[in-house]
A protein has these predicted regions:
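Donor/substrate-binding cores of folate-linked one-carbon enzymes
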Residues: 2-134
Length: 138
């Protein structure tokens, strides 16, 4: 799953022979839920991408692979710019580990999450893709 905004029902997950995986553009367990790119800057948490198993929670499944990403934020760097970098990085992480995912040859990292889930409705109203990060956050 990537960009899928629906919650998969517990009975469907339970009855599958293999786990469902999700490609998430945050460095889990930080910034679970919607719009993790924004929240990573707002809350000054690590930025990155994660491939994890889907469980009955929202972005709470075991971590399979993840990568931290460092951004050089200039005056005009927008959320759109950083989103496309994250999207590119999650694709590269998936391609690099696709064979391991298919074969099931990977180690799992249990998530320990203490932070609150981020919801789309919590986003500031004035935020848009072209908003410069420095203007809005820093």
């Amino acid at each position: 799953s990537y960009g899928y905004r629906k919650i998969i029902k517990k009975n469907i997950i339970k009855n599958l022979k293999r786990p469902i995986i999700n490609l998430h553009i945050s460095y889990l367990p930080h910034n679970r839920g919607a719009d993790p790119n924004f929240w990573s800057f707002k809350n000054k948490t690590p930025k990155g991408v994660t491939i994890h198993e889907i469980d009955s929670g929202i972005d709470t499944g075991d971590i399979l692979f993840r990568k931290k990403i460092k951004f050089l934020i200039k005056k005009d760097t927008s959320f759109k710019h950083t989103y496309f970098i994250l999207r590119n990085e999650i694709e590269k992480l998936f391609k690099k580990n696709c064979t391991k995912i298919i074969s099931g040859k990977y180690s799992k990292i249990k998530q320990i999450y203490k932070k609150k889930l981020k919801l789309k409705k919590n986003l500031p109203k004035k935020l848009n893709w072209d908003t410069p990060i420095k203007k809005f956050i820093i």
